[in-house]
Amino acid sequence: MPRSLKKGPFVDMHLLKKVRAGNESKDRNMIKTWSRRSMIIPEMLGHTIAVHDGRRHIPVFITESMVGHKLGEFAPTRTYRGHVKDDRKARRR
């Protein structure tokens, strides 16, 4: 269920401080974060945020179409390797 409009978007304060500091200094260095729950706001446009996927940080470049989504949506946590095409063990039974 989406968040109430009267509350506004949730962004972790430590992440918001880093984004605002980058905007003030016109510095676009990569920001490393573990906050997958933070919503992408217009202030983040043009930044590259490295989102943790449980094992490593995935760099995500923020574009206009991403505003309103959560950071975790762009760093998948599970690796799908596909189904086995020719499984000889299953065929024998």
From Swiss-Prot:
GO terms for cellular component: cytoplasm; small ribosomal subunit. The keyword Hydrolase does not apply. Keywords: Ribonucleoprotein, Ribosomal protein, RNA-binding, rRNA-binding. Pfam families: Ribosomal_S19 (PF00203). PROSITE patterns: RIBOSOMAL_S19 (PS00323). The keyword Ribonucleoprotein applies. It comes from the Bacteria. One of its GO terms (biological process) is ribosomal small subunit assembly. InterPro entries: Ribosomal_uS19, Ribosomal_uS19_bac-type, Ribosomal_uS19_CS, Ribosomal_uS19_SF. GO terms for molecular function: rRNA binding; structural constituent of ribosome. NCBIfam families: rpsS_bact (TIGR01050). Belongs to the universal ribosomal protein uS19 family. Protein S19 forms a complex with S13 that binds strongly to the 16S ribosomal RNA. This is Small ribosomal subunit protein uS19. The lineage of its organism: Bacteria, Bacillati, Actinomycetota, Actinomycetes, Micrococcales.
